[in-house]
């Protein structure tokens, strides 16, 4: 072997990477990408903050409390005369109520007016006695005592009013799914008669995850 061949062979040997160095670098890059993705998700979660009545939707899994999901029910108030009231107890699906000891953290009501809506309604959620028949007199008294937040939803000619949600926090009360039958959504039609096809109420109940939560919004 002449000198040039020896030099070339030495150069080639120096270029050869160490055994395993390439795979170690790839593994480090992959770990860095995973960490970056996790930090990105964390930043998005922190930026979103806790759900408030100003969020365009209630909560997805990243906005629920850790270990929580939510179930939704829809209420269609019947015709309500001017100055009169409507009340409906919260009845969750059987697949949820069988886990009656799971804690509930929040209830949110979203008001969805239909095209004919051109009135003003007051909406609240209250814990009511089991003996209550949700009569007009009983509901009127609950609106008047100031014990619960009230959403005043008014007709907006330009479309849906921005403030169309009411958030009710039950965390301090340690309420559970079994307690939900003790709560009711109450509506007061202040200025006009409300027709049956004018308003829809979506009620979101945030609760601890249950075994069937795979079919619930997450």
From Swiss-Prot:
What UniProt keywords are attached to this protein's entry?
Acetylation, Capsid protein, Ribonucleoprotein, RNA-binding, T=3 icosahedral capsid protein, Viral nucleoprotein, Virion
Segments carrying the region annotation (Disordered) are 1-29
Question: Which InterPro entries does UniProt cross-reference here?
Answer: Cucumovirus_coat, Cucumovirus_coat_Asu_sf
Write out the annotated subcellular location: Virion
Q: GO CC terms for this protein?
A: ribonucleoprotein complex; T=3 icosahedral viral capsid; viral nucleocapsid
Q: What are the Low complexity biased-composition ranges?
A: 1-10
Q: Which GO terms describe its molecular function?
A: RNA binding; structural molecule activity
Q: Which family does it belong to?
A: Belongs to the cucumovirus capsid protein family.
Domain remark from Swiss-Prot or TrEMBL: The N-terminal arginine-rich stretch does not seem to be the major RNA-binding region that allows formation of an infectious ribonucleoprotein complex.
Name this protein carries in UniProt: Capsid protein
Originating species: Cucumber mosaic virus (strain As)
């Amino acid at each position: 072997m002449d000198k040039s061949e020896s030099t070339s062979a030495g150069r080639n040997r120096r270029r050869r990477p160490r055994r395993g160095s390439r795979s170690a670098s790839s593994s480090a890059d992959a770990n860095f990408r995973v960490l970056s993705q996790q930090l990105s998700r964390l930043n998005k979660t922190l930026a979103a903050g806790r759900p408030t009545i100003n969020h365009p939707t209630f909560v997805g899994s990243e906005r629920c409390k850790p270990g929580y999901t939510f179930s939704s029910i829809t209420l269609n108030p019947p015709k309500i005369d001017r100055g009169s009231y409507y009340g409906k107890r919260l009845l969750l699906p059987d697949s949820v109520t069988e886990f009656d000891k799971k804690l509930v953290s929040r209830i949110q009501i979203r008001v969805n007016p239909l095209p004919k809506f051109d009135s003003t309604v007051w909406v609240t959620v209250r814990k009511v006695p089991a003996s209550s028949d949700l009569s007009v007199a009983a509901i009127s008294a609950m609106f008047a005592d100031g014990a619960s937040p009230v959403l005043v939803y008014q007709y907006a000619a330009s479309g849906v009013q921005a403030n169309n949600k009411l958030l009710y926090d039950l965390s301090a009360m340690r309420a559970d799914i079994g307690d939900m039958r003790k709560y009711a959504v109450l509506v007061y039609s202040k200025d006009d008669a409300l027709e049956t096809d004018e308003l829809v109420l979506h009620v979101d109940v945030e609760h601890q995850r249950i075994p069937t939560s795979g079919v619930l919004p997450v």
